[in-house]
Amino acid sequence: AVNTAMQAIDKIRDSSTSHERCSIIEVMGRNAGYIALWCGIASGAEDILIPERFDGNRPKLENELIESILEKKALGKKHHLIINAEGVGHSYGMAKRIEQATGVETRASILGHMQRGGNPTAKDRVYASTMGAMAVDLLCQGKTNRVVGYKNGQFIDFDIEEALAMKKTIPAYQYDVAKTLAL
């Protein structure tokens, strides 16, 4: 999903740059902001909006974005890229408010299910083959209710109930890196 989204983001960014616009690109991520975070870092987005960092206060968020755009505009920045996870949402409303408040032409693009398409990377294919083989091996050993995954450089298996209870959090350092790269 990230690679497919990046293809679209690169094209939108080119247009945003040449027309001196602000672009809000909404990517998948209803409950988790990993796709938005990775796309934001990879694209050098000025702002990345993820559910894990959104407190539900939309006016406050929009004011922060407006301030960010105006600050960067004062420094000579001619375009602005915002990657927005769908869990934060309201991209069209944000675009309208930003344009009204800053005078910067602002467009929202929602990538939606397009991100689910595309060819898997070589890494995706190797991981899928390895995990599939491991799952078959586990079944041949009489082990059921197992989940196969990849962690710390190794393919592993664990109980399905344990897997369902796991919570994956956004690394604070990675989010901070994204903010630093956007300067």
Describe the residue ranges of each PLM region.
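Generic long, charged, amphipathic alpha-helical segments
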Residues: 107-109
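Short, amphipathic alpha-helical "lid/cap" segments that border enzyme active or binding sites
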Residues: 2, 62, 128-136
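Short glycine/threonine-rich loop-to-helix capping motif typified by GTGT followed
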Residues: 93-96, 120-126, 158-166
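Accessory alpha-helical/coil subdomains and C-terminal extensions
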Residues: 1-105
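Phosphate-binding loop/pocket of nucleotide- and phosphate-handling active sites
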Residues: 146-183
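Short, hydrophobic alpha-helical segments
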Residues: 9-13, 136-143
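Catalytic, metal-anchored helix/loop core of enzyme active sites in primary metabolism
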Residues: 97, 114-129, 136-140
